[in-house]
Amino acid sequence: MKNNYISTCIVYLMAALLLISVISIKECTADISDYGDPCSDDLKDYCIHGDCFFLKELNQPACRCYTGYYGSRCEHIDHN
């Protein structure tokens, strides 16, 4: 009985890890306009490796990073 329980747990764990892997490789396809308006010209270089948009509700700029980059201003490269 104990071995059966362990086998069942392993199967569920493997399925969960596979699901996480599939979800993590899916690329975001949302339009930047879904997040806010494009940044003004004075903020055009705010995002180092990404697109800048302005969040009206927070009254601040934000970035949508290009694939392979992350950080609040897309300043870090993902080496994985």
Curated annotation (Swiss-Prot):
The keyword Mitochondrion does not apply. SUPFAM superfamilies: EGF/Laminin. Keywords: Disulfide bond, EGF-like domain, Neurotoxin, Secreted, Signal, Toxin. Residues 35-75 form the EGF-like domain. Disulfide bonds join C39-C52, C47-C63, C65-C74. PROSITE patterns: EGF_1 (PS00022), EGF_2 (PS01186), EGF_3 (PS50026). GO terms for molecular function: epidermal growth factor receptor binding; growth factor activity; toxin activity. InterPro entries: EGF-like_dom. The keyword Disulfide bond applies. It comes from the Eukaryota. Expressed by the venom gland. Its main location: secreted. One of its GO terms (cellular component) is extracellular space. It is found in: Secreted. Residues 1-30 form the signal peptide. GO terms for biological process: epidermal growth factor receptor signaling pathway; positive regulation of cell population proliferation; positive regulation of mitotic nuclear division. PANTHER family: EGF-LIKE DOMAIN-CONTAINING PROTEIN, TRANSFORMING GROWTH FACTOR ALPHA. Belongs to the EGF domain peptide family. Ant peptide with probable defensive activity which acts as a potent agonist of the mammalian epidermal growth factor receptor (EGFR) (EC(50)=6.3 nM). Mimics, both structurally and functionally, vertebrate epidermal growth factor (EGF) peptide hormones. In vivo, intraplantar injection in mice causes long-lasting (several days) hypersensitivity of the injected paw to both mechanical and thermal stimuli. Its long-lasting effect is unusual for venom toxins whose effects are usually immediate. Is the major venom component. This is OMEGA-myrmeciitoxin(02)-Mg1a. It comes from Myrmecia gulosa (Red bulldog ant).
